[in-house]
Amino acid sequence: MATTTMTMIQALRSAMDVMLERDDNVVVYGQDVGYFGGVFRCTEGLQTKYGKSRVFDAPISESGIVGTAVGMGAYGLRPVVEIQFADYFYPASDQIVSEMARLRYRSAGEFIAPLTLRMPCGGGIYGGQTHSQSPEAMFTQVCGLRTVMPSNPYDAKGLLIASIECDDPVIFLEPKRLYNGPFDGHHDRPVTPWSKHPHSAVPDGYYTVPLDKAAITRPGNDVSVLTYGTTVYVAQVAAEESGVDAEVIDLRSLWPLDLDTIVESVKKTGRCVVVHEATRTCGFGAELVSLVQEHCFHHLEAPIERVTGWDTPYPHAQEWAYFPGPSRVGAALKKVMEV
């Protein structure tokens, strides 16, 4: 299959384009996703190509957007819905938890909610406290939801196509800092302009990436780093700069979790560091630490370390002090190696 060099934005648009063409039941909607093409231009050109009945705008009502999507899914459509920022999902919480996640269970399988809820998440664009949150832990503990976060254009397209085809409701979190290329997380360097970021080769047509399989992005033997989204690149840079032979695992799917890959890696290395951008207390990293303790306790050579955002709102002026950069991750890698 031919490939094209794409950003994550372009890869996501390509995924929706492929599925709109393949399946007449697929519809795309949300705030400003029609003619405007979305606040990040992920849906640019799709309404022109497929018409206003397939790609259309929604009122500024997250609860109404999700509730409508649940109804569409119950009656045969496959909605791909955008919440403009993950920070805005809170008004839709009841629809997500009580309706979207539980429809199949509550109807004894008579109805399903095969919808994909796309949400840009995380910091790195100076969005401040209301445009920078990483709320993944709130979704992973809701029974009935799948939660996905890609870290690169190839995975973004393949995971989004797989999500649209899935009969389960999927929370699809998109790290904004990666929209136009990878980022190494150094807050003590000028932020690389998006136009200069390297892109990735992405197949032009249809393909999928499994919704429940992690990827080892950097093989290693000394310590296992469990991470996802933007911090995948931070962990890779930290491993190189610290000189620690770290194995970096990109979870890709936060739930269901690829526990087999995690356990196999930690049993091999005997050490584990968990890295994510969200706040520390009750963050998804706490669940990862618990699972590693349960399944790998007798193989551990050192206590598990966590490197996360701080337990504060996301500060605009101090964004890079909040963000877990390579220096903090590198210090954790060295710490577990000293035990």
Swiss-Prot record:
InterPro entries: THDP-binding (IPR029061), Transketo_C/PFOR_II (IPR009014), Transketolase-like_Pyr-bd (IPR005475), Transketolase_C (IPR033248). GO terms for biological process: branched-chain amino acid catabolic process; response to nutrient. Keywords: Oxidoreductase, Thiamine pyrophosphate. Transmembrane segments: none annotated. One of its GO terms (molecular function) is 3-methyl-2-oxobutanoate dehydrogenase (2-methylpropanoyl-transferring) activity. Its EC number is 1.2.4.4. The keyword Oxidoreductase applies. It catalyses: N(6)-[(R)-lipoyl]-L-lysyl-[protein] + 3-methyl-2-oxobutanoate + H(+) = N(6)-[(R)-S(8)-2-methylpropanoyldihydrolipoyl]-L-lysyl-[protein] + CO2. Its cofactor is thiamine diphosphate. Gene3D superfamilies: 3.40.50.920, 3.40.50.970. Pfam families: Transket_pyr, Transketolase_C. Heterodimer of an alpha and a beta chain. The branched-chain alpha-keto dehydrogenase complex catalyzes the overall conversion of alpha-keto acids to acyl-CoA and CO(2). It contains multiple copies of three enzymatic components: branched-chain alpha-keto acid decarboxylase (E1), lipoamide acyltransferase (E2) and lipoamide dehydrogenase (E3). This is 2-oxoisovalerate dehydrogenase subunit beta.
